[in-house]
Amino acid sequence: MKNIVIIITVAVSFNLFGESLQMVSSEKYPLYRDDSKYDCLINGYNPYCQDICKLHNTKEGYCKNYFCICEKLSKENVKFLSEIIDTCNERLDKIL
C-alpha cells in the first residue's frame, strides 16, 4: 500500500514539475487580433515565421507544430502587429 502511495506521489510531482517548466518557456506564439495563431507549413526554420517574429519585435522565430513561435517574445508584443494595424486603421478612418 505504501508503495502505491509513493508511486502516485512521484507521478503527480513529475506532472506538476513538467507543467511548471512549460510556464517558464521563453517561446511564445505571436497572435492575430482575434487571438488566433499564425499558421506555417514547414516545421523548423521558416522564413515566414522569422518575418512575423520580427514584426512582433523579436529576432528569432520558427515553425513548431505548424504554428509560428517567437523566442523571447514579451507579453506586450504578443499582439504587437495587431496594435499597429488597429492604429493605422484608426488614422485612415480619421482621414477618410
From Swiss-Prot:
Tissues/organs with expression: Expressed by the venom gland.
CDD domains referenced in this protein's UniProt entry, alphabetically: neurotoxins_LC_scorpion
Subcellular location: Secreted
InterPro entries attached to this UniProt entry: LCN-type_CS_alpha_beta_dom, Scorpion_toxin-like_sf, Scorpion_toxinL/defensin
Disulphide bridges, residue numbers: C40-C63, C49-C68, C53-C70
Signal peptide start-end: 1-26
Any single Pfam family the record assigns to this protein: Toxin_3
Domain LCN-type CS-alpha/beta: 27-89
Keywords: Disulfide bond, Neurotoxin, Secreted, Signal, Toxin
GO molecular function: sodium channel inhibitor activity; toxin activity
GO CC, alphabetical: extracellular region
Notes on the domains: Has the structural arrangement of an alpha-helix connected to antiparallel beta-sheets by disulfide bonds (CS-alpha/beta).
Family: Belongs to the long (3 C-C) scorpion toxin superfamily.
Protein name: Neurotoxin 67.1
